[in-house]
Amino acid sequence: MPSLLSLVLTFLAVSSPSCCQNSDTASPKASNGASFPWNNMRLPEYITPIHYDLMIHANLSTLTFWGKTEVEITVSQPTSTIIMHSHQLQISKATLRRGAEEMLPEEPLKLMEYSAHEQVALLTAQPLLAGSVYTVIITYAANLSENFHGFYKSTYRTQEGERRILAATQFEPTAARMAFPCFDEPALKASFSIKIKRDPRHLAISNMPLVKSVTVAEGLIEDHFDITVKMSTYLVAFIISDFKSVSKMTKSGVKVSVYAVPDKINQADYALDAAVTLLEFYEDYFSIPYPLPKQDLAAIPDFQSGAMENWGLTTYRESALLYDKEKSSASSKLGITMTVSHELAHQWFGNLVTMEWWNDLWLNEGFAKFMEFVSVTVTHPELKVEEYFFGKCFNAMEVDALNSSHPVSTPVENPAQIREMFDEVSYEKGACILNMLRDYLSADTFKRGIVQYLQKYSYKNTKNEDLWNSMMHICPTDGTQTMDGFCSRNQHSSSTSHWRQEVIDIKSMMNTWTLQKGFPLITITVRGRNVHLKQEHYMKGSECFPETGSLWHVPLTFITSKSDSVQRFLLKTKTDVIILPEAVEWIKFNVGMNGYYIVHYGDDGWASLNGLLKEAHTTISSNDRASLINNAFQLVSIGKLSIEKALDLILYLKNETEIMPIFQGLNELIPMYKLMEKRDMVEVETQFKDFLLRLLKDLINKQTWTDEGSVSERMLRSQLLLLACVHRYQLCVQRAERYFREWKASNGNMSLPIDVTLAVFAVGAQNTEGWDFLYSKYQSSLSSTEKSQIEFSLCISQDPEKLQWLLDQSFKGEIIKTQEFPHILTLIGRNPVGYPLAWKFLKENWNKIVQKFELGSSSIAHMVMGTTNQFSTRARLEEVKGFFSSLKKNGSQLRCVQQTIETIEENIRWMDKNFDKIRLWLQKERQELL
């Protein structure tokens, strides 16, 4: 997981959608030209794996490995064909034993391969009998992957400059088949016995503890690992390296260890302590003991995503696990804690109970994202993570407001379609609708439901409806009040008594959130004591919403000027009326932003709330203030609110001190001038940036150049000083220049305050000498935070040659790791000097980029959006359309392409409608902030 609310707040973060492509529907032909006996991306249901015996022998000198897989299977109907997954494996021999005993004779199997589906067919001479057990034995060899998936090569350099090689795995979603032939679908769970052959100077680790090590030849050791629990193939993991480790025990006797390269093992203590605390929390919260004897956390030098939940051996980017007490930032501590929490939550949600198929990935990822906040709120209260949750919902809404979005639960089939599911909708929206349900039912009732779900489906697979059925048992629909009244609610209504009892049908309610895309816009119109409600599908791209037929069961919450007690109302129809006990001056819906919807206040509703913010903004919570900012600008996009009124509302920020309203204000305002930077609008762009600095000037001037304060205060300081320095606020620039001179004079040995380092580096990188010095320190730094800060600073250079060099070197991966390339490309794509270079680089190197990062991956989506989605001219739109349409199957159908095209179209409409209004508003309001 990237550091929360970090660099991207200044250079607008892009979404991480993925892509899809159609499966091959032609008559299948095997690699030898013969007819392949199976024509489906999914494996047949009549063969089930029971147990795998895996032997892996990797040679880290030749970068090859060979393996032997013995898989015990059962057959439910007679067949002469065994269909398995295999990708880029050279199978040399395949045999069959008719039984599970090793002493039984082996008979040869005829092998056929169909690479389009990444499948092999093993044909038997005599049919397999229903109800019988068989063992398939396959011997094979392959190259270690040069990418970030399968069984792949990773490298690092020691402090002395020696290059060392290790091998690690990343199998989710469909890459276990790149390491061993298998039944690579999440519902085909089995147990695994793993043996690894290695050089004596290396260490092997896997899902389970080491049972014994045997010397099988001179210079060759075979490690035997304990048998696993029943689990999906994508959770298998093994690493061969020279890592060092530190360990602790949980109260229940689970050994927790953190592994890292030797030079960085001193940065493992924070994650180790966090992991122990979080594992103990989850065992208590879920009322289910962690089922394995150990939990390893390994920091991999080359890693495409943030982390991976392999059962018993979670893997991470170094930046997502290692914490340097001297140099790591407050946001880094927050990010590491959340990432460790996420992966450990998966040990229950995802590993113990797994979605049946990838269409319900959100059952894994939405829950893990949600549990990050539930757990860390308790285990690390000083981080105040509850303040940041609603920001995840805004991220999801950015994607979910587009026509190219998809339901939380949506059909997928081929690997690229599966990879596209790893996006904001599965993660953030999934988490947000769970939080909304928890808020509505109460934390205790919700917890009872998910514990029942986990207990019922342990070591099994589930579908969307299984979760809601578990909740239904907690909240029956027979009209009786249970669980302290949480399942039958009294709520305001338009009935003559002003109250009615509302029975909650969890399944029907939540299906409206998981089986249809998008989210509702709730329009509130107050007439005396009557509050008129209307819901419609919020969708960008039109000021007149199409009648989609979408209807949600919306658990509304509200407070008023007369009562800060949260009131609730379940809106299940297109319109309804709430009758208040008395007239009110203002009403605020979606309290705390716990609901996944946005609100428009009709008539003078926005004027009342604007007045509240100007006169007494602390009357409502900081989350409520931030949600008003977000909702106002979302309404500008669809023509429900004028840009002038939204900008008027945000003027109150000159009196704001809390992190989330300020960050939300920046998230709304920065994209506006980023659009202007890419067009010839220098005068208004400059005026807008000046306005932003004046708006926050008092707060910027109050920032100390220290590391004092809470995590949120430190994160706010870092971002405000960076903003001020990047926009050449002289008080900031002068101090940053002085710090940089002193730091450079010390050859980078002087300790800078961590919170101001980013601003100092950003200023220092603006001349050639400073840029070159920063790059030299990047090469030798052992701190992930410091490397990230330098990387950002190098990317905001105004020197096109430097920017082009960064693109070239990060893509080659020799000096700057290839895993950094998507981020570097996106940062340069946000740079007003660099964006043409980034877009050109993406186009010219598309085929190579897809080979490195896989069609459908979130990295590809990140790069597509990051280089194009701040365009706002018709010429650029046609250029983007033309390029991607020319790719055909190699990219034209990517969801991220549809998203960026929609976004550019929206940018064009937005600028056409609002640019002149902003120019006039700036002239009118200029004096107000002086």
Swiss-Prot record:
Annotated coiled-coil segments of the chain: none
Record note on cofactor: Binds 1 zinc ion per subunit.
Positions of substrate binding: 172, 306-310
Top-level lineage group: Eukaryota
Alphabetical GO biological process terms: adaptive immune response; antigen processing and presentation; membrane protein ectodomain proteolysis; peptide catabolic process; positive regulation of angiogenesis; protein catabolic process; proteolysis
Tissue: Ubiquitous.
Residues annotated as transmembrane: 3-23
Required co-factors: Zn(2+)
Cellular localization per UniProt: Endoplasmic reticulum membrane
Residues binding Zn(2+): 342, 346, 365
Gene Ontology CC annotations of this record: cytoplasm; endoplasmic reticulum lumen; endoplasmic reticulum membrane; extracellular region; extracellular space; membrane
Main EC class the enzyme belongs to: hydrolase
Paired cysteines (S-S): 393-432, 725-732
Keywords, ordered alphabetically: Adaptive immunity, Aminopeptidase, Disulfide bond, Endoplasmic reticulum, Glycoprotein, Hydrolase, Immunity, Membrane, Metal-binding, Metalloprotease, Protease, Signal-anchor, Transmembrane, Transmembrane helix, Zinc
Residues exposed to the Cytoplasmic side: 1-2
Record's function text: Aminopeptidase that plays a central role in peptide trimming, a step required for the generation of most HLA class I-binding peptides. Peptide trimming is essential to customize longer precursor peptides to fit them to the correct length required for presentation on MHC class I molecules. Strongly prefers substrates 9-16 residues long. Rapidly degrades 13-mer to a 9-mer and then stops. Preferentially hydrolyzes the residue Leu and peptides with a hydrophobic C-terminus, while it has weak activity toward peptides with charged C-terminus. May play a role in the inactivation of peptide hormones.
Subunit composition and interactions: Monomer. May also exist as a heterodimer; with ERAP2. Interacts with RBMX.
Protein's name according to its UniProt entry: Endoplasmic reticulum aminopeptidase 1
Source organism (scientific name): Rattus norvegicus (Rat)
